[in-house]
Curated annotation (Swiss-Prot):
Protein's gene: Tyw5
Binding site for 2-oxoglutarate: 106, 166, 175
Protein name: tRNA wybutosine-synthesizing protein 5
Keywords: Dioxygenase, Iron, Metal-binding, Oxidoreductase, tRNA processing
Domain (JmjC): residue spans on this chain: 102-267
One term of GO molecular function: protein homodimerization activity
Domain of life from the UniProt record: Eukaryota
Pfam families: Cupin_8
Classification via PROSITE patterns: JMJC
Length: 315
């Protein structure tokens, strides 16, 4: 079966009211052009970021290969002064390096104490945070975090989903974003919130034969573009150039639905986690049966879940 590739729609000059009343309820990805993002799109050069961002220590991912894999952890965590990170990430080859002269760098900013604090560029990088204007296309009390992201050219981030809605603001550089519909999760060979399929452009079909059935939505983000990624939509990111971006995460569900210990915004909602725990206990109970009976009752359970929990309101 040939994979289905679909373009992510692009709209220019969308107002807050248009987004919230007509676009947001559709729960589909959308590229927004022409939004007021402040002076960051003109200011954030390598020199400016290095000078103004200063020598604050940041924890980064360092990979010897372009395709980062969170499941096998084919990268290491290291610490660099922010200005050094910016300079190295902008290079193709390095005189100073941790693994190899062509290693790749990736920053996903953290709170001051990642165990307790969420990332907010205005708090962790106040000298730069004032340059960016957030598109407040949500209620202020829904705001969760603003994550600073810096990537080396060629770096590919694994396919994963987040449990909160977010805007990916591409401040400088260019990214290719590939998204997959949450309803196609069964084709993505998941391990937790991540897909095992690293090479989405040329997957191993002997190992992942169902992957081409997943609908694939694609867009190219350039400086000044903002991508709306609804919660639960899988996304894979390739930095085609050295790039700087900021993610704005906000709560789509009431606050009490989320895990209060989650500072990254990637823990499943409390009710979902509880349901999975109950399922694990049910599977353990089923294992007490002989194979023939276990298979029979497992199929009955699947049919019941499909009947009671699957929605007919989503494509």
């Amino acid at each position: 079966m040939a994979e289905q590739r679909l373009p992510v729609p692009r709209l220019r000059g969308v107002s807050r009211e248009q987004f919230m009343e007509h676009l947001y309820p559709q729960r589909k990805p959308l590229v927004l052009e022409g939004l007021d993002l402040g002076s960051c799109t003109s200011k954030w050069t390598v020199d400016y970021l290095s000078q103004v961002g200063g020598t604050k220590e940041v924890k980064i991912h360092v990979a010897a290969v372009p395709q980062m894999d969170f499941i096998s952890k084919n990268f290491v965590y290291r610490t660099l002064p922010f200005n050094k990170l910016v300079q190295r990430a902008a290079e193709e080859t390095h005189k100073e390096f941790f693994i190899s002269e062509d290693e790749k760098y990736y920053l996903r900013s953290l709170g001051e104490d990642p165990r307790k604090d969420v990332a907010d560029i205005r708090q962790q990088f106040p000298s730069l945070g004032g340059d960016i204007t957030f598109p407040m296309f949500f209620r202020e009390e829904q705001f969760f975090s603003s994550v600073f992201r810096i990537s080396s050219p060629g770096l590919q981030l694994w396919t994963h989903y987040d449990v909160m809605d977010n805007f990916l603001i591409q401040v400088t550089g260019k990214k290719r974003i590939t998204l997959f519909n949450p309803r196609d999760a069964q084709y993505l060979y998941l391990s937790g919130s991540k897909s095992e399929v690293l090479n989405i452009d040329s997957p191993d079909l002997d190992k992942y034969p169902l992957f081409p059935k997943a609908r694939r939505y694609e867009c190219s983000l350039e400086a000044g573009d903002v991508l709306f990624i609804p919660a639960l939509w899988f996304h894979n990111v390739v930095s085609e150039e050295f790039g700087v971006g900021v993610n704005i995460f906000w709560k789509h569900l009431p606050s009490e639905c989320y895990d209060t210990t989650d500072t990254y915004g990637n823990k499943d909602p409390v009710a979902a986690s509880r349901a999975v725990q109950i399922l694990d206990r049910a599977l353990k109970t089923l294992a007490e049966l002989p194979e023939e009976y276990r298979d029979f009752y497992a199929r009955q359970m699947v049919l019941r879940i499909q009947d009671k929990a699957y929605s007919k309101n989503f494509e």
